[in-house]
Regions:
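Pro/Thr/Ser/Gly-rich low-complexity, intrinsically disordered linker/stalk tracts
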Residues: 1-21, 86-92
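Extracellular beta-strand-rich solenoid/capping regions of secreted or surface-exposed proteins
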Residues: 9-10, 22, 128-136, 147-164, ...
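Hydrophobic loop/turn residues within beta-sheet-rich immunoglobulin-like superfamily modules
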Residues: 20, 61-63, 178
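Recognizes extended acidic, P/S/T-rich segments that occur
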Residues: 27-64, 76-84
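Hydrophobic beta-strand segments within extracellular beta-sandwich modules
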Residues: 69-70
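Acidic Gly/Asp/Thr-rich repetitive segments characteristic of extracellular carbohydrate-active
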Residues: 95-140
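Right-handed parallel beta-helix
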Residues: 160, 164-165, 169, 186-197, ...
Length: 356
């Protein structure tokens, strides 16, 4: 129930259910109006017939609709037990060139359009109002371009949001001063954004998809974070694509290290599952990438990552390290630069399937 990414790529969706004890036949009801499906009778257009099997194939369901269905079961004596109402939506690409495990993110489709009308940190017409005002699914578009200086962290917690940075006029939007990311967002689309945190005295990250599910970040440019440029710890069904993560501040009083310690971290990537492709990591001291699969609730190695067709340039003392349970690592290009002191780009140190 509530599968919002049902696979109808072959032109149909097969629904299945488990028969109740004593059920002799199953009445199938399906449509795009929940109230009509819930109240439908055998004379309603939503009624698709009675059958003994426990699967039903819906041919060419619209990708623009939510489909509702129920199964009424009849026993040998003719007694009918009405079924519960179930729902699904057919999956489709977030946008034409979306790839990877987050490619079916809904974003704000079918919801409201919210306009960012100024570059203020908060208040009416601000980006913060558009993000934090929980009004349901929405697409955030921009009537202004320029620099938004945040006074506190800006986090997307809601689901079904599209951040359409490509709508900003001129050179687009730059977010500076604090982190801009997610915490538990589902079905989110973030595109064409620039994040330049800068030195503020706080150990800010740059951006990320922390805790997100069925979400995608595309054409983002991120630099000058204190901790790390990007993080996706705890995420599921993610894509980071066609993004630049560069020039993290390297000796900038990171709160977890003694003064003068180099940090300048590019990205810690987690996900179950996550895709990271066609990205550029440049001029970062470390974590290019750091695989943050971690451990699951039972203590076993976690994280399934596809990492392909990325470029890593001019890292410092750390290239790619960390750990994950399953990794596809294909077609990535590493080029040393003037800052490079570690000349091993990737070292597969341990293959384990048990607990960490």
């Amino acid at each position: 129930d509530r599968d919002w990414h049902a696979d109808g790529d072959s032109g149909y969706i097969t629904m299945s259910w488990k028969a109740a004890s004593g059920a002799a036949s199953h009445g199938v009801y399906i449509g795009t109006d929940s109230a009509k499906v819930e109240k439908a009778t055998t004379s309603s257009p939503e009624y698709k017939g009675s059958q003994t099997g426990t699967t039903y194939k819906l041919v060419n369901p619209s990708v623009h609709k939510t489909w509702w269905w129920r199964i009424d079961e009849k026993d040998a004596s003719g007694r009918v037990v009405p079924g519960k109402l179930w729902a699904f939506e057919r999956r489709r690409l977030a946008f034409p060139d979306a790839e990877g495990y987050g490619r079916y993110a809904h974003g704000g489709r079918g919801g409201k359009v919210v306009y960012v009308k100024n570059l203020n940190d908060a208040g009416a017409g601000s980006l913060r109002e558009a993000v934090e005002n929980s009004i349901g699914p929405r697409t955030i578009v921009f009537e202004v371009g320029g620099i938004i200086t945040l006074k506190s962290r800006l986090t997307i917690n809601d689901s079904r949001i599209t951040y359409a940075g490509q709508t900003a006029p001129g050179k687009g939007i730059v977010i500076r001063g604090c982190s801009f990311g997610t915490a538990g967002m589902k079905d989110g689309i973030i595109r064409f954004n620039k994040v330049r945190v800068g030195y503020t005295g706080n150990t800010w990250d740059g951006t990320g998809l922390t805790g997100a599910d069925f979400s995608i970040m595309d054409h983002v440019s991120q630099s000058w974070a204190i901790d790390e440029g990007f993080s996706s710890r705890g995420g599921k069904n993610l894509t980071l694509q066609r993004t630049m993560i560069a020039e993290q501040l390297n000796v900038a009083n990171h709160q977890n290290y003694p003064a003068g310690t180099a940090h300048g971290y590019a990205a810690t990537i987690g996900g179950d599952v996550g895709s990271f492709h066609h990205n550029l990591l440049a001029h970062n001291e470390g974590r290019n990438w750091s695989l943050g699969g971690g451990l699951d609730a039972a203590g076993y190695y976690a994280g399934r990552l596809d990492i392909f067709n990325n470029v890593v340039y001019n890292w410092g003392g750390r290239a790619t390290d960390g750990g994950a349970h399953e990794v596809n690592f294909v077609g990535n290009y590493y080029k040393e630069g003037a800052a490079t002191t570690q000349h091993t780009t990737l070292n597969a140190q341990l293959e384990g399937t048990g607990k960490g």
